[in-house]
Amino acid sequence: MQSTVDVVIVGGGVIGCAIAYYLSKSGVDVAVFDRGEIGAEASSSATGLLAPLGPLSGPGPFADLLLTSFSLFPELVPELEEASGIKLEYEQTGALRIVRNPKQISNLHKRMKAWQPLGLQMHWLTGDEARQQEPLLTPVVCAAIYAPEESQIKASQLVKAFSCAAANYGTTFYSHREITGIQQHNSRVTDVYTAQGESFACNHLVIAAGAWAAHCSKWLKVTVPIIPQRGQILSLHQPLPPLHHIIFGEAAYLTPKSGNMVIVGATKEEAGFEKHLTAGGIAWLLNTAIRLTPALESSPLDQMWTGLRPRTPDNQPILGPAPDWENVTLAVGHGSVGIMLSAITGKTIAELVIKGEVPKIAHPFSLTRFEQPFQA
């Protein structure tokens, strides 16, 4: 006799694993399916920035979502570390957003004014003051915003911790098990099918398939408007003296990491599912990093890699019920902030599944905002 699992989650990245963690912690029977290894795609490629100011232009629903998730990490980190036995390398390093051209100062002022209602600490620095914080910054830096609360975490460790803790609470993980179809009764999914021909009965289906979420459209008959966006990233050995803060400038960032490394990221490219590195992408990263911090010119290269972000048309996630389905929930399209949004997404989707009601914070992120009819 076929057993039935309470919730099947399609996608074993940081979002799927976070949802599994919050559900299983509440006693829900969960199974997570991934087309590859658990956490092997964008979640492990990510830099792990917990820096909410950058994606925001001011207050609003997206700011509420990001800042709420950001505020969960100080308590979530020790909880996850204890439940999983994995250290997350969570650090409140603070971030500097710098400009090198005096003509850009007014725009930086405007950004700071727009961010002030968000409630995060910010300090305006002159170029000299910025170099006091980071002596290796370019001599031509003329102004900066310092946000001391912005933080970072080791992304690959976070997804491992979510998955290990969820497994300890009873979640079953199926790697290399791509879900390729469903069985339905009226407007409910009753079973899911894998590429290997296996069948699993479930009471609820959650789609958290990252850049591959649009592939679910054909069997849900719901348009999920997500495309992959390639990000190229590299790491360098730290210069001397080492960098201590996250540095944002000229559409790139530098992030000091354990092991005496600095991560430089990241390109944003529409390249389909092509994950290869390009000479142009790596050259842009290196040139920008050296413009911001000239001492990096002599730093040995460490590694280079890519990841595929799941991007929606408005660069905000899709959270909530799938239209015309009673027991299908979407948690997709987190773009470049999946690590930062993992906490609130896991908590919110678990609450939705358990209580049957969409939490207020998720209302603005319904798929229905796009109103795209399904095309087979």
Language-model features: where?
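Helical element adjacent to the flavin cofactor pocket in flavoenzyme catalytic cores
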Residues: 145-196, 200-204
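Dinucleotide-binding Rossmann-like beta1-alpha1 core, especially the glycine-rich loop
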Residues: 48-129, 133, 288-290
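N-terminal Rossmann-like FAD-binding beta1-loop-alpha1 element of flavoenzymes
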Residues: 5-31
